[in-house]
Amino acid sequence: MSKKRKKRSPCPVACSLDLLGDKWTLIVIRDLYLGRSRFTELATAPESPPTNILTERLNRLLESKMVRQIPANDGTKHRAYELTEKGRALRPVLEALRDWGLKWIPNTQTLLGKVI
């Protein structure tokens, strides 16, 4: 069931943070960029959220049309996830966060490499 979230303001920064600003959503999007596409791959990634939170974040990303479900590419009836155009449009945001972290947070290293 879809919950209609009330906007706290018309500010695009506030609205974007309402959708993306929790602890896990951008990590899930990053992992999709890194090629993880199935729930089990996302759930076993080094920085994965608990599975109940992963399910909730994926549902929110599906609802907001940043991610879509597709058939798994292994011929099974399992489903996979991929970023939509809207989700891929977050690439510069992830790159900016990566670059900022590399510059200002000691002992960080990129997982994204040339992927984004």
Where are these predicted regions, by residue range?
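Basic, amphipathic "hinge/linker" alpha-helix immediately C-terminal to the N-terminal HTH DNA-binding motif
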Residues: 21, 73-96
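Basic amphipathic alpha-helical segments that dock to polyanions
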Residues: 54-64
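N-terminal helix-turn-helix DNA-binding core of bacterial DNA-binding proteins
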Residues: 11-53, 82
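Amphipathic alpha-helical dimerization/coiled-coil segments
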Residues: 91-116
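A detector for short, charged/polar N-terminal pre-domain segments
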Residues: 1-9
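Short beta-strand "wing" residues that participate in macromolecule-binding interfaces
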Residues: 69
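Glycine-centered, phosphate/nucleic-acid-interacting loop/turn motifs that mediate DNA/RNA or nucleotide
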Residues: 24, 65-66
